[in-house]
Amino acid sequence: MYAVIVTGGKQYKVAPGEYLKIEKLEIATGESVTFDRVLLVGNGDDVNIGAPVVAGATVVAEVISQGRHDKVRIIKFRRRKHHMKRMGHRQWYTEIKITGIQA
């Protein structure tokens, strides 16, 4: 069984037992989180597509950890002007484990 969920403005295809890094959620480590914006639920050849969401479908996950991704380095410079600016960004994430899909 698998599902497509929306969280943090992105869509993820998930299945029970999968680990996933999503945009940061303000939920403590070890707690459970429920995603109710389920766009699609599939079980073998039986696929249920929502319009826009599947009615009554939820995905339950457990929060494993919070952290930050690797640094993305940014360099801005102006040609011929001896001007260069170096910056970086580390995005926060929440790692979850999918525990169940109810359709």
Swiss-Prot record:
This is Large ribosomal subunit protein bL21. Part of the 50S ribosomal subunit. Contacts protein L20. One of its GO terms (biological process) is translation. GO terms for cellular component: cytoplasm; ribonucleoprotein complex; ribosome. Belongs to the bacterial ribosomal protein bL21 family. Pfam families: Ribosomal_L21p. Transmembrane segments: none annotated.
